[in-house]
């Protein structure tokens, strides 16, 4: 049972931890349903009817909001306001402004807020009692109350954006997990937050195994700020979101040209629709036109796990209704302009190359020493008829003089090289 206490509004605002403290990034948490607002944009209904909020806002359970960028809401003010996320605003999606008010009620010793609008001259109060964001007129019940929880450097222990790796069971050869992201806000990679760095992909190369590889190139490390609208790969220490923390900072960004592109990576905000709206100027409100889906294409490969169980960029699998929408807030590899016709798997990592040959390193241990002399001597002494007893040597390295065969001359040259090193 939640403890509801009537307090003086000003005292609540000063003493409580979770509160609106000026323009910035927040999560909006319903008291009654214990769910969070996220801006999804799966449907649009630009009208003055407050029910227009219902299709463009999805309420998330606590476990889901941790890793969903759509739950990171930029709130500019408490007056006639709009909620900004995913490159759009609730005003541009619905045509409705919100009035956010600090109430005189505290819940769990934290101040709560009311979200209001006006419809046909009647006040409406937004609520969530488990069926999504709807408007009512009565108020007073827990589902009408909202906590506004800051997401910033000071809140990192309790409120952050956590990254969910593309697969929590498959790491790279060094034990790192990988995630992708594309968001409308800059974010920092905090020290000891679990995210080692942000990476891009600049090229795809073939390895000596005749497979293709995309080697991540590090562009930002811990303590750095990743700019908004830049699709990146993120190298993560943990298999779960709470172990891979990033923090939104700075000003929210807008970009009317989606998908967003950086090197060979592309990214999006929404899954189902492109973003065509600029909320920078009031006269452009309402221009959000969902005319194109962010669909998979032959040259788009998403990060996942290959058939042989390795991290790789592969084609997006079709869903049950045969739609191949690319997931929201992700980055994918665009090989459209590369000469890779028919290539459907590109492994994440450095392409294997021919090992460097050290002249005289007959044993193949990477060091030129007396052991190499013994290997060549053994190789030459054992008769060809006793091939199975010959020492295993690197013929190319043992052929020190490069005449195409291993001989006593090579032994002499190896010994001479060792003496010169001393």
Where are these regions (language model features)?
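Hydrophobic h-region of N-terminal signal peptides that target proteins for export
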Residues: 9-18
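Lectin-like carbohydrate-binding module/patch detector with strong preference for beta-trefoil
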Residues: 19-157, 255-262
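Surface-exposed turn/loop modules enriched in turn-prone residues
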Residues: 45-67, 177-210
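Cellulosome-associated attachment modules in secreted, modular CAZymes
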Residues: 50, 62-64, 68-69, 352-422
């Amino acid at each position: 049972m939640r403890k509801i206490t009537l307090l003086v509004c000003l005292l609540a605002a000063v003493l409580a931890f979770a509160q609106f403290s000026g323009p910035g990034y927040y999560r909006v948490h319903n008291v009654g349903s214990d769910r969070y607002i996220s801006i999804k944009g799966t449907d649009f209904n630009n009208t003055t009817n407050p029910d227009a909020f219902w299709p463009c806002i999805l309420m998330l359970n606590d476990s889901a909001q941790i890793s969903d960028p759509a739950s990171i809401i930029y709130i500019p003010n408490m007056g006639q306001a709009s909620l900004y996320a995913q490159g759009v605003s609730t005003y541009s999606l619905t045509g409705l402004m919100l009035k956010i008010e600090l109430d005189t009620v505290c819940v769990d010793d934290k101040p709560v807020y009311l979200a209001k609008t006006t419809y046909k001259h009647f006040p409406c109060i937004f609520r969530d009692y488990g069926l999504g964001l709807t408007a009512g007129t009565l108020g007073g019940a827990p589902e009408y109350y909202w906590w506004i929880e800051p997401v910033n450097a000071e809140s990192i222990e309790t409120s952050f954006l956590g990254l969910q790796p593309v697969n929590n069971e498959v790491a790279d050869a060094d034990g790192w997990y990988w995630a992708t992201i594309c968001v409308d806000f800059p974010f920092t990679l905090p020290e000891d937050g679990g995210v080692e760095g942000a990476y891009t992909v600049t090229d795809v190369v073939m390895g000596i195994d005749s497979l293709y590889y995309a080697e991540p190139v590090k562009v930002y490390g811990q303590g750095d700020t990743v700019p908004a609208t830049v699709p990146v790969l993120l190298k993560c220490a943990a298999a779960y979101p709470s172990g891979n923390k990033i923090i939104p900072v700075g000003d929210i960004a807008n970009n009317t040209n989606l998908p967003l592109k950086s090197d060979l990576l592309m990214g999006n905000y929404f899954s189902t629709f492109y973003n065509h709206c600029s909320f920078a100027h009031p006269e452009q409100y309402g221009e959000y036109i969902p005319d194109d889906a962010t669909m998979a294409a032959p040259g788009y490969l998403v990060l996942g796990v290959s058939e042989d169980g390795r991290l790789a960029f592969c084609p997006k699998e079709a869903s049950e209704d045969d739609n191949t929408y690319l997931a929201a807030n992700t980055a994918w590899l665009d090989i459209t302009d590369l000469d890779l016709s028919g290539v459907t798997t590109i492994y994440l990592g450095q392409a294997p190359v021919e090992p460097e040959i050290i002249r005289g390193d007959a044993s193949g241990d990477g060091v030129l020493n007396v052991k190499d002399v013994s290997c060549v001597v053994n190789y030459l002494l054992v008769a060809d008829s006793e091939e199975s007893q010959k020492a295993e040597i690197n013929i190319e390295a043992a052929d020190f003089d490069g005449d195409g065969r291993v001989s006593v001359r090579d032994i002499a040259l190896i010994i001479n090289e060792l003496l010169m090193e001393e």
